[in-house]
UniProtKB/Swiss-Prot annotation:
InterPro entries: Anoct_dimer, Anoctamin, Anoctamin_TM
Gene Ontology biological-process annotations: calcium activated galactosylceramide scrambling; calcium activated phosphatidylcholine scrambling; calcium activated phosphatidylserine scrambling; chloride transport; establishment of localization in cell
Reaction equations catalysed: a 1,2-diacyl-sn-glycero-3-phospho-L-serine(in) = a 1,2-diacyl-sn-glycero-3-phospho-L-serine(out); a beta-D-galactosyl-(1<->1')-N-acylsphing-4-enine(out) = a beta-D-galactosyl-(1<->1')-N-acylsphing-4-enine(in); a 1,2-diacyl-sn-glycero-3-phosphocholine(in) = a 1,2-diacyl-sn-glycero-3-phosphocholine(out)
Gene encoding the protein: Ano7
GO molecular function annotations of the record: intracellularly calcium-gated chloride channel activity; phospholipid scramblase activity; protein dimerization activity
UniProt keyword Metal-binding, yes or no: no
Protein name as annotated: Anoctamin-7
């Protein structure tokens, strides 16, 4: 049943927790008042009591005191009204508010410290369907490699004891009326963890209005976008570096544990303390690092096998008969010009290029392609099991189906409500047909951006052709001989520049389009945004490698009848084949992108941090030790996980889709990821403000993208081996002519047609299976049939084996299934109500828990 949403007055608040005593907590003062830093001392955020809860959230805004009369004063006054209204509504929602100001002659920085009383926490914990513990269990986290090494009796250098290991719990959705059943409910100070408190505070901040909601005047995100507040963040629980004396007496706090045992470079060879990461940063961040560590571990066998295959290629360079024939051919093969203004050339001059091509094009690449296809299938199958185990252990297995609430931005702007069939509650609703129309409109924009990428690719192709002509005319013999490779290498660099520029533009455009599409939940919003950006980035990053792998050298023509693009002759593959050029392109894009990203991740946060400290140095106060909120404000805002996931998924594509051309790709990916894990860990622990802990039950649509890339990789490698490699022509020649491949080089070269020979008064050869008139020879058609048959057999074999592995490996481990049933039984026994089993019956208590004496509040 659909209903139009009633128009609400501006003064409506989420929950009226006001009381005669609330005024004390709401006296946050005027923005004109300021106190010197260091005069007001407040306990650190991790210290709290029932009398004064810990600091749960901090809001910050800056005020310029130099130009009170300026053209932007009207805007400043509007911001002041919005800010005061917002803070008043927070106060009415039950939050306790303190204000601390730091100023100098020029500017003031205002800090709003938010605390949530016990009653507010209980009310919103039930409203958000948060899961809280019923019974503690010993932490049974295990790692398959640790188990294997222990069984073999081999010392495990990856294992390290991390103090204060979080226990596991049986848990269920919180009900205030059944408070006594929950573990630790007798201690109001510790019952809600810091991450749970942050989630509740952020929900309140996201929904609180500061004007008319239908006009979009609600929520902290909009206030940050408008510049009303400059920051909103929960506090870290203390400094990340521990003082030796205090750590021995008091022990390490959670942030210090993560720094000492996870974020330090010296821990590159240790298991990640994922349970500690989850406890401090939430499930979404922990799942990212779990996936990154899992993927990196699986890269190790792929890197070893790929390195062995490459070394085999190095050995074959000096023993391969066709390569030796080419290098020792002297002036036996006079080759046709490679461009309209180029001269004839000797095939023996391309000896180095042919040897380089042999490094990547040999029989071992067929085995490696098959190995990597099955590797990718097994990687995803075992990740599903790992994900299911973590999702259960972290109480988020059914988060998306039952727990996840509509996005605040969606709830405020949706035109009607509808009954949720799972929870039985009325929720904001946006008609699906309207959303589909908007998504189709967004798809048109995506296609336009893809067209821009293709235009850039064509420009790079033309650049390479023109550059090859210019360099080939050089008087320098080295430059003339390497003209095509120099043009290809510089073209790869130009292509990388185009890629990085277009990426920045489209990400901003995709954010606008996805907000316009009105997705109900944050998960749906992120999935839609991710898919848009990935499709664009896929074309952006892979267009050039796809061109080299499957199109370059296919539409060249023959001497006397060459095909052109915009009047410029189409490119040919070099003497070593296009596979070596594809390997070069992959290494330039993949390794170049990794180096640029890692340099950015190291330098940019440092530079931003130094700039923030410099720009706010005069506002930091005169005290030796700044207050916790001042110290955290100097940190960088957390930018989320999207770019981290995108970087890894694009890398996964390079490792799998074109692995037949570059067996060293897994090795470079492994080395990068060892650095990436610690870089990302240091950013979250040391350089970022603490993000709001977000729940998630998996890595979202990224898993489906990885599955699609795995299927695409099988097809791509099959076509690479069949059409871009010399593997099948060599096999065919060894079967039909000479098993030792003597004469294979001459077999692959055609003679120029008589018309071309008479016009130039000189005969020449070119790479093709054509007769003397330029028509395809019977050998070409025979090889074409063999190639197509190879593609069909290869992909059927790999997909069949993958399907069998999918059936043999259960998605959820049996031990997890047993634990889920056990937890279901305990929840039923503890709550003894059918609504606890279903999450909710559809009718919520009319009164907030402030009316319940069991919550410890005055009646």
């Amino acid at each position: 049943m659909l209903r139009g949403q009633a128009r609400e007055e501006d003064s409506v608040v989420l929950i009226d927790m006001a009381s005669p005593e609330a005024g004390n907590g709401c006296s946050y003062g005027s923005t004109a008042q300021a106190s010197e830093a260091g005069k007001q001392q407040v306990a650190p955020s991790r210290v709290g009591s029932s009398a004064k809860p810990p600091i749960d959230f901090v809001l910050v805004w800056e005020e310029d005191l130099r130009n009170q009369e300026n053209p932007t004063k009207d805007k400043t006054d509007t911001h002041e009204v919005w800010r005061e209204t917002f803070l008043e509504n927070l106060c009415l929602a039950g939050l306790k508010i303190d204000q601390h100001d730091v100023q100098d002659e020029a500017a003031a920085v205002h800090y709003i410290l938010l605390r949530a009383p016990w009653a507010v926490l209980c009310y919103y914990a039930e409203d958000l369907r948060l899961k809280l513990p019923l019974q503690e269990l010993p932490n049974q986290a295990s790692n398959w490699s640790a188990t294997l090494l222990e069984w073999l009796g081999i010392p495990n250098i990856l294992l390290e004891h991390v103090p204060d290991t979080p226990p596991e719990y049986y848990s269920c959705q919180f009900k205030a009326s059944k408070l006594q059943w929950f573990l630790g409910s007798d201690n109001q100070d510790t019952f809600f963890t810091s991450t749970k408190r942050h989630q509740i505070l952020f929900e309140i901040l996201a929904k609180t209005p500061y004007g008319h909601e239908k006009k979009g005047l609600f929520g902290i995100d909009q206030l940050l976008a408008e510049g009303v507040f400059s920051a909103a963040f929960p506090l870290h629980d203390g400094p990340f570096s521990a003082v030796p004396e205090s750590s021995q007496v008091l022990g390490l706090i959670q942030r210090q544990v993560l720094f000492q045992h996870w974020a330090r470079w010296g821990k590159w060879n240790k298991y990640q303390p994922l349970d500690h990461v989850r406890r401090y940063f939430g499930e979404k961040v922990a799942l990212y690092f779990a996936w990154l560590g899992f993927y990196t571990g699986w890269l190790l066998p792929a890197a070893v096998v790929g390195t062995v295959v490459f070394l085999v290629g190095c050995f074959l360079v000096f023993s391969d008969i066709p390569t030796q024939e080419l290098c020792h051919s002297s002036d036996s093969f006079d080759m046709c010009p490679l461009c309209s203004d180029c001269s004839f050339w000797l095939l023996s001059s391309a000896c180095t290029l042919a040897q380089a091509g042999r490094l990547f094009d040999h029989g071992g690449t067929v085995f490696f392609s098959l190995f990597m296809a099955l590797w990718a299938v097994l990687l995803l199958e075992y990740w599903k099991r790992k994900n299911a185990t973590l999702a259960y252990r972290w109480d988020c297995s059914d988060y998306e189906d039952i727990e996840e609430r509509p996005r605040p931005q969606f709830a405020a702007t949706a035109p009607m409500t509808a009954l949720n069939p799972i929870t039985g509650e009325d929720e904001p609703y946006f008609p699906e047909k309207n959303r589909v129309r908007r998504m189709l409109a967004g798809s048109v924009v995506l296609l336009m951006m893809v067209a821009v990428v293709i235009m850039c690719l064509v420009s790079v192709i033309l650049y390479r052709a023109v550059m090859a002509i210019i360099v080939s005319r050089s008087d320098n013999a080295f430059l003339s001989a390497w003209a095509s490779r120099i043009a290809s290498l510089t073209g790869s660099v130009v292509n990388l520049v185009f890629i990085l520029i277009l990426s920045k533009v489209y990400v901003l455009l995709a954010q606008v389009l996805t907000r316009w599409e009105m997705h109900r939940t944050q998960t749906e919003f992120e999935d839609a945004f991710t898919l848009k950006v990935f499709i664009f980035q896929f074309v952006n990053f892979y267009a050039s490698p796809v061109y080299i792998a499957f199109f370059k050298g296919r539409f060249v023509g023959y001497p006397g009848n060459y095909h052109t693009l915009f009047g410029i002759r189409n490119e040919e593959c070099p003497a070593g084949g296009c596979l070596s050029e594809l390997a070069q392109e992959l290494l330039v894009i993949m390794v170049g992108k990794q180096i640029i990203n890692n340099v950015q991740e190291v330098l940019v946060p440092k530079l931003k941090g130094c700039w923030q400290k410099f720009s706010r140095g005069k506002k930091a106060g005169t005290g030796t030790h700044p207050a916790p909120w001042e110290a955290d404000y100097e940190l960088l805002p957390c930018e989320g996980l999207f770019h981290e996931y995108l970087e890894m998924v694009l890398q996964f594509g390079f490792v799998t889709i074109f692995v037949a051309a570059c067996p060293l790709a897994p090795l470079f990916a492994l080395l990068n990821n060892w650095v990436e894990i610690r870089l990302d860990a240091r950013k979250f622990v040391c350089e970022y403000r603490r993000p709001v802990a977000e729940r998630a039950q998996d890595i979202g649509i990224w898993f489906h993208i990885l599955t699609g890339l795995t299927h695409l990789a099988v097809i791509s490698n099959a076509f690479l081996l069949a059409f871009s490699s010399d593997f099948l022509p060599r096999v065919y020649y060894s079967w039909t002519h000479a098993p030792d491949l003597h004469g294979f080089l001459n077999f692959t070269l055609a003679r120029a047609p008589p018309t071309f020979t008479s016009a130039h008064n000189r005969t020449c050869r070119y790479r093709a299976f054509r007769d003397d008139d330029g028509h395809y020879s019977p050998t070409y058609w025979t090889l074409l049939a063999i190639r197509l048959a190879f593609v069909i057999v290869f992909e059927h074999v790999v997909f069949s084996i993958g399907r069998v592995l999918d059936l043999l490996v259960p998605d959820i481990p049996e031990s997890v299934e047993i634990k889920v049933k056990r937890e279901y039984y305990l929840a039923k026994q503890a709550l003894a109500e059918n609504e606890a089993l279903l999450g909710a019956t559809g009718v919520k208590d009319d009164q907030p828990p402030s009316s319940e004496p069991s919550l410890g509040l005055p009646a």
